[in-house]
Amino acid sequence: MDKVFLVRWYGSFNGEDALDELRLWERSHPECECNLYLIRGYKKHAKTTTHYDIGQTIQDAAKRFANQGHHINELHRISEIWVGCFANTVPDKKDISLVERMLICYASSEVGNPNMLNQICTDYAPPQNVYILSEWYNYTTLKQYERVRRDSVAKIIPDVIAYRVTEEKTSILFISEKLKKYWY
């Protein structure tokens, strides 16, 4: 059976106050139950090498980041954080893990495995067709972004990831980096 997920990403929470801003935003928007997150930052003494973390959470993302042993503690400077909410379904643990794995697998191929902090599945292929649609929202205005910054982690994750399994059990990955408006 095909799986289709619409993920609304809210961000980007930037700079030194990113975690505090995220914590306040989550408190003021309890209707947004965010189960996914994207982080971009730098390890200690790193000047140019950017590292990424993609993960899932059942609790608030800010609480998840405070957990002992979380990858965010490896980042000395956090450039940005995005949190993702499922808009078309109430996901169970398997659905959240499926989307997380597909995003990690795709991002690993884009930025390179050494730059990914979470490497639980850098080579993953689900057994069924899976479609992930991403929409990017400004967390302060709750309006959809027309464009995101050139260096944003939102540029790495495409608006559409379509994973197809053919009748011959061959895996095919289709993406659309950014959808464009057709009607105004």
Positions of the model-derived regions?
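Boundary/linker segments flanking structured domains
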Residues: 1-51, 58-184
